[in-house]
Design a protein with these regions (language model features):
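Structural motif
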Residues: 2, 51-52
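Conserved class I S-adenosyl-L-methionine
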Residues: 1-16
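Class I S-adenosyl-L-methionine
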Residues: 17-18, 107-150
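Conserved SAM-binding motif I beta-strand of class I
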Residues: 22-26
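Short glycine-dipeptide loop
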Residues: 84, 88-90, 94-101
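Short strand-turn motif at the edge of the Rossmann-like AdoMet-binding core
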Residues: 57-58, 104-107
Length: 150
């Protein structure tokens, strides 16, 4: 199985941070990805047949000088939407016709529903954690598995 991690960072979500069949992408060279690139413009040929896409995008519009910003970078709300939408489109371009995407989101500043709508032309929810109305109002992290649209 070929895996493409489009927001590798420090690989905190990985149990094996150097999984052999994974291409780790990040735009920051200091985190030592396999490829230094913007996930919205990958230097990968179309249809390179990735089976699984891992996408844990930036989700919080934090101050430029905070601890979290120094670790994950500073992004405005519109930049975050651009990253999510552009990466979803690019992931579709380089993935197999039956690929899946493991997607992580925290509704710190933008609702999960609104973010999924940005991805809808290319990816559709298959299953994931359902949330209550109360948890939608709180800052909660969710994982979902998406299926590539044809």
């Amino acid at each position: 199985m070929k895996i493409l991690d489009l927001s590798a960072g420090n690989r905190a979500i990985w149990f094996d941070r150097f999984y052999r069949d994974t291409l780790y992408v990040d735009r920051r060279a200091e985190v030592n990805p396999t490829i230094v690139a913007d996930s919205r413009a990958l230097p990968i040929e179309t249809g390179d047949a990735y089976d699984l896409i891992v996408f844990d995008p930036p989700h919080a519009n934090l101050g430029a000088n905070g601890k979290m910003s120094s670790r994950y970078g500073h992004h405005t709300a519109s930049e975050i939407r651009s990253i999510v939408e552009g990466t979803a489109k690019e992931a579709h371009r380089v993935s197999r016709h039956d690929a899946l995407m493991s997607f992580k989101w925290n509704n710190h500043d933008q609702s999960f529903k609104n973010i999924l709508e940005l991805m809808a032309p290319w990816w559709e929810p298959l299953f994931g954690q359902k949330t209550s109305e109360r948890s939608r109002r709180l800052r909660s992290t969710q994982w979902i598995l998406l299926r590539r649209r044809s």
